Amino acid sequence: MKKLLLMGFLISAAVYGEDFQVQTIGVAGKYYQSFYKSDKKIIPVPLINLNYNRFFLNGVKAGFTLYEEEDFKFSAIIDPLGGYFDGFTVKAKDMDKGYEKIEDRDSKFMYGLNLDFNLSENVFGNINYMFGEEGDKGEAYLTYVGYITDRLVILPSISAKYYSDDFVDYYVGVTKKEVLENEKIKKEYKGDNSFSLGASITAEYSITEQFIMSAFAGYEYFDDKISDSPLIDKDNQVYYGVGFRYSF
């Protein structure tokens, strides 16, 4: 098949050719101010793309290719850390004073379907829909690949995400128990269907043929069904970071 760039949550990319597959292993550090009333966070982001026949590992998501054509690939995937890389997970101990007795919002195992596709030589996209114990979510991405030099590539990207009412309620809903135990929470809150819109840019520089350095930054806006929760500090999240990966 023609070149197909497949990106994970941030910048885990693999390039497929007609007779070869490029495997990558690496890690990035992502820094962001959580939209919760909590501390800033730094989290590791795995930059992994490993493939064996129809099986693959992209970041922490494992999958199996169900159908593949020249410009698209349809897969079944699982995500053992659903909600984590989106910024939805939070520990009570990390919340601001007056909110630190809430229940932890943990990552959840999720499963679903994934579609990677090319729109042109320089534009590729991804659509996926995931189901889980605490609700479901859908994501859509479009990314442009700008080749600046033989070593430097710029990748601007836009995204739209949907969150079901159960997903929103688990992460930003507030129970009566939490109102009673946290002095700054004054009311219960029931989550509803919501969405977010995002934009990001990534720069990738090939130090050698195998070692690649990446720098990225992004912005995500959250609908008021999320931002109106008593647990939420603002309706947006800004993040940035750097990463390194090895290709073989």
Regions found by a protein language model. Give the residues of each.
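Outer-membrane pore/translocation modules
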Residues: 59-143, 147-155, 159, 167-191, ...
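Sec-dependent N-terminal signal peptides
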Residues: 3-13
